[in-house]
Amino acid sequence: MAAYKLVLIRHGESAWNLENRFSGWYDADLSPAGHEEAKRGGQALRDAGYEFDICFTSVQKRAIRTLWTVLDAIDQMWLPVVRTWRLNERHYGGLTGLNKAETAAKHGEAQVKIWRRSYDVPPPPMEPDHPFYSNISKDRRYADLTEDQLPSCESLKDTIARALPFWNEEIVPQIKEGKRVLIAAHGNSLRGIVKHLEGLSEEAIMELNLPTGIPIVYELDKNLKPIKPMQFLGDEETVRKAMEAVAAQGKAKK
């Protein structure tokens, strides 16, 4: 018997996902298709009768708007929402804004996969002359971050290292109080939570593809260990296609 339930949702497709560009900390909004994905995710939660007590998200609008859309669909827009940079997407450094397929053609698919999916290899850092440096590093939403906290690039390991303290200190106590928690975030920050929950190896987490806009349900025991595999709310075909689309992002176009 599950002691707790936890629901995660990766934001719907963003405008830069649509253009196959590395988004990272750039504040790309949802594409029209991404907005529809978020609506369908919300409808799936509504149809399954889910209610929540508190929500967590990043400070990036694609995740925030996904959460808004879900809360609208389930008619729970009044719920408290905690936003934190610690749930932001991984910072892709110097790759930010580059088209993934073009980068794969230039550097090779293997190198792009290492940058995207290796556990501890960061991409090249974002230098001050990068076209999006000021847009990100000087943004006032990050004004309270120390120099050590504000990244110029991150590996998956780095992303998990800044997300997990928030999970342990802020989210876990809410779950243990019996609060029904919804987290709307990003592929890599959510991957960190999944790795922690399931005790996955570095190799396994590299291959994990979380689909956009599809609610992921965990049933947890009193020690917050999953009692069954993650469950996707949505029809099987939609889930399969979404996961394949995520896996295809770093491949060069033929």
UniProtKB/Swiss-Prot annotation:
EC number: 5.4.2.11, 5.4.2.4
Modified-residue entries (N6-acetyllysine), positions: 106, 251, 253-254
A single GO cellular-component term on record: cytoplasm
Signal peptide: none
Modified residues (Phosphoserine): 14, 23, 31, 118
EC supergroup of this enzyme: isomerase
Residue numbers bearing the Phosphotyrosine modification: 26
Record-marked site positions (Transition state stabilizer): 186
Entry-annotated residues carrying N6-succinyllysine: 251
Tissues expressing the protein: Expressed in the liver and brain. Not found in the muscle.
Domain of life: Eukaryota
Swiss-Prot/TrEMBL catalytic activity: (2R)-2-phosphoglycerate = (2R)-3-phosphoglycerate; (2R)-3-phospho-glyceroyl phosphate = (2R)-2,3-bisphosphoglycerate + H(+)
Subunit structure comment from the entry: Homodimer.
Family: Belongs to the phosphoglycerate mutase family. BPG-dependent PGAM subfamily.
Role noted for this protein: Catalyzes the interconversion of 2-phosphoglycerate and 3-phosphoglyceratea crucial step in glycolysis, by using 2,3-bisphosphoglycerate. Also catalyzes the interconversion of (2R)-2,3-bisphosphoglycerate and (2R)-3-phospho-glyceroyl phosphate.
NCBIfam families attached to this UniProt entry: pgm_1, PRK14115.1
Protein name in UniProt: Phosphoglycerate mutase 1
Gene: PGAM1
